[in-house]
């Protein structure tokens, strides 16, 4: 179990490499949307691509586990904490690049930047095409790894290429080189997304803003965004909606410990204050079991689990 505030030999070793901000025994709950879970043995923010590669090389040589913490949305940290290295890429680690022509444009942003940054840069250059990503929490790196999206589109619809760091260096992969599917992508083993290039087009920015404003308004009305939250909890099964199935199973508003199935949207969990990762994971498991019993559907969690669960 990782103890908060305790500096281990690993944290000291990483500090000796230089080029990184290292926090030993750092509580991770404040860095996740659900505000639950334990601490990181070593939370590391690399200050350069070279420092990131050096970290990955150290981890490979010494058999140290590496976890990636993006924006903390849909991420559940175990109450026992996260051993090894927990990497968090700063949003400004890489410069933004805009290559905009008369009819189209390519935007390259760092993977540690929030998804909303893409939306803002897109609008600044009078580009359209990624409206469906507006309002999705998390980082661009997380959007790549989860192929984030809504009913109106998915990230890989507008991704042209991704840059990935491994212990052997940094290189670009085209979209064709990254297998992806609904809420999933397959990156090289041990790889960390560092930059993302988006292919967009010139268009009606007024209409684009209207679409995004409508989507954001709908989210605010139907999702528990004013509370520490976790969602969507499950991917939608083919031809149905996870929230409908959970509500049909009688679990909307159901609580386990201090975690509750949202009364606004049954495919979300909220932290009522003081919830543990055990509470949240127990509720996820219960939702899955009840829906299977009620409707015969084996729902797939849209959850990234990090660390040790007690």
Swiss-Prot record:
Residues 35-203 form the FAD-binding PCMH-type domain. Gene3D superfamilies: 3.30.465.10, UDP-N-acetylenolpyruvoylglucosamine reductase, C-terminal domain (3.90.78.10), Uridine Diphospho-n-acetylenolpyruvylglucosamine Reductase, domain 2 (3.30.43.10). PROSITE patterns: FAD_PCMH. Its EC number is 1.3.1.98. Pfam families: FAD_binding_4, MurB_C. It catalyses: UDP-N-acetyl-alpha-D-muramate + NADP(+) = UDP-N-acetyl-3-O-(1-carboxyvinyl)-alpha-D-glucosamine + NADPH + H(+). Pathway: Cell wall biogenesis; peptidoglycan biosynthesis. InterPro entries: FAD-bd_PCMH, FAD-bd_PCMH-like_sf, FAD-bd_PCMH_sub1, FAD-bd_PCMH_sub2, MurB, MurB_C, MurB_C_sf, Oxid_FAD_bind_N. The keyword Methyltransferase does not apply. It is found in: Cytoplasm. Its cofactor is FAD. GO terms for cellular component: cytosol. GO terms for molecular function: FAD binding; UDP-N-acetylmuramate dehydrogenase activity. GO terms for biological process: cell division; cell wall organization; peptidoglycan biosynthetic process; regulation of cell shape. The active site is at 183, 232 (proton donor), 302. Keywords: Cell cycle, Cell division, Cell shape, Cell wall biogenesis/degradation, Cytoplasm, FAD, Flavoprotein, NADP, Oxidoreductase, Peptidoglycan synthesis. Cell wall formation. Belongs to the MurB family. This is UDP-N-acetylenolpyruvoylglucosamine reductase. It comes from Myxococcus xanthus (strain DK1622). The lineage of its organism: Bacteria, Pseudomonadati, Myxococcota, Myxococcia, Myxococcales. The gene is murB.
